[in-house]
Amino acid sequence: MKKIVSILMCLLALKSFSQDTDQKFIIITTDGLRWHEVFKGMDSLIAIDPRFNQDDSLGLFKKYWSSNLLQRKALLMPFFWSTIQSQGQLYGNRNLGSKADNANPYWFSYPGYSELLTAQADTSINSNDFPPNPYENVLEHFNKKSNYKNRVAAFGSWNAFDRILNEKRSGFPIINAFDDNKIALDQPDMKLIHQMIMTGFRPFGNSEILDVFTHYQAFTYLKTQKPKAFYISYGDTDEWAHHGEYKFYLEAIHQFDAWIKEIWEYVQSDPFYKDRTTLLITTDHGRGDLKKENWTSHGQSIPDAHETWFAFIGPNVKPLGEMK
């Protein structure tokens, strides 16, 4: 029987952790990453299309292509298809009958993140400009528990997370985009990263920073402040897709995989986190594929943009690999 799984189910699974004072979790998202690249690697039809390959089709095929599916997806996401495949679970390969979908009917970012983080697919949340979220999010839920209080934080590339997570109400630090980061600034690395964010080039304008800054802010915070419930949201995948730049989109996916590896290897090497930390990795929405040119887009006008995926790895996750 084919299974249709909502990312809401992932959130419900996490809530049971609060009964165990030793358990930690990290939710990691990357915006608008298609399941097609996760489970099938580089799409050759997009990579040969001069509208999208940035005049480097040869380079893309040299770096990311193999006619063997297992090799091809491992070239793009080596950590996913080694460690997570052997030690965790991956959902969303529709070719195997594993279907992960948005529960909301809109298929863009604010509604997608809201349902993921609050377990509420409220149709009134229908705009990326929606005001502060009325629903309690999972991080807020944990921050109310005595064993997690003040050990919760979130970092995001996009400036909407202070609204999605309702920073004024939630009671934990939420650092997104060009926020004036006042947390952990006693750390020299944090000061330098913040200075680079504020003075560097802004390819995505004033609403979003490059993921490299988000990652190293979050990773520094993880190592120095030791949060027990943590969220990191990356955005380069969506930005480069909207720009129609498939080379940069693939590079962003490859880098995302490398950063997850870095996070996992760190938590498995640190006594505070080792064998007590679960990673949930997912996305907020899908993108088009029925018409290849729609890979750049999502939303209600794109009929397959509701198709998502997710992965788990952690001490209480059975090593079942790619789910069918």
Annotate each language-model stretch with its function.
Residues 1-22:
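Bacterial Sec-dependent N-terminal signal peptides
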Residues 22, 40, 44, 65-224:
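Active-site-proximal alpha/beta segments of enzymes that process anionic O-linked groups
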Residues 25-27, 35, 255-296:
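Metal-dependent active-site segment of extracytoplasmic phospho-/sulfohydrolases and closely related
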Residues 25-29, 36-37, 91-94, 115-117, ...:
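Structural recognition of the beta-strand scaffold that forms the well-ordered cores
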Residues 41, 49, 282-313:
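Histidine-centered active-site microenvironments of extracellular/periplasmic hydrolases
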Residues 71-77, 129-135, 250-254, 303-306, ...:
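A short beta-strand-to-alpha-helix junction
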Residues 113-119, 297-324:
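Substrate-binding rim/cap in mid-to-C-terminal beta-strand-loop elements of soluble/periplasmic
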Residues 168, 216-262:
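Active-site His/acidic residue clusters
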